[in-house]
């Protein structure tokens, strides 16, 4: 009976088809892209992309955390890590002062590799992100020699309009609530979207939708700088 009512095979088929279309279109835009079946394959793939001795910076990303790349790098003990958003076991910043985090964030631009997620990726091969501080999207488009972007298949959308709709009406409210619940950030908890789940295009001082960046590919001379690993699981927000 269960075999007739579960949708595991159908979900796998649906996500794989969309992922392969997305990978093909990213590659047409001079972005390296690869589809892997699960987080375990993603971890192996990314670790193979990071040579010993290079400096790795991390952008704030649930997907990077869920795949477990940073603990694996720490265990390997062969790479310097830059993470302005590093937190302790209670979810609090290791660097509580904003000037400390700003200084470390600037160091990200000289990293050899930047590890990060993306808010959405379109079927026609565009990466869409909305950021609060701007450090994450800035390093994606300029600075580090190589960018490795990890993304779950749940973030594949039809086009830029659908991406922005998803970000403003799902990703942003969820992220604001996450920062409130898991990182004790009362300022984010007071945002309208964190209270109601609905975006009202607010002008709150702590609004997290500040910088919108759409990556439509890279110039041929930058081919291979951006590397997308699409994972056949629902990851991140």
What is the meaning of each model-derived region?
Residues 107-237:
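Conserved phosphate- and dinucleotide-binding cores of soluble alpha/beta proteins
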Residues 100-101, 133:
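Amphipathic coiled-coil/heptad-repeat helices and related helical stalk/stem segments
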Residues 1-29, 34, 54, 95, ...:
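SAM-dependent methyltransferases
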Residues 1-3, 87-97, 171, 175:
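Short N-terminal helix-initiation segments at or just after the protein's N-terminus
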Residues 15, 19-98, 105, 110-114:
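N-terminal active-site beta-alpha-beta segment that forms phosphate/nucleotide-binding
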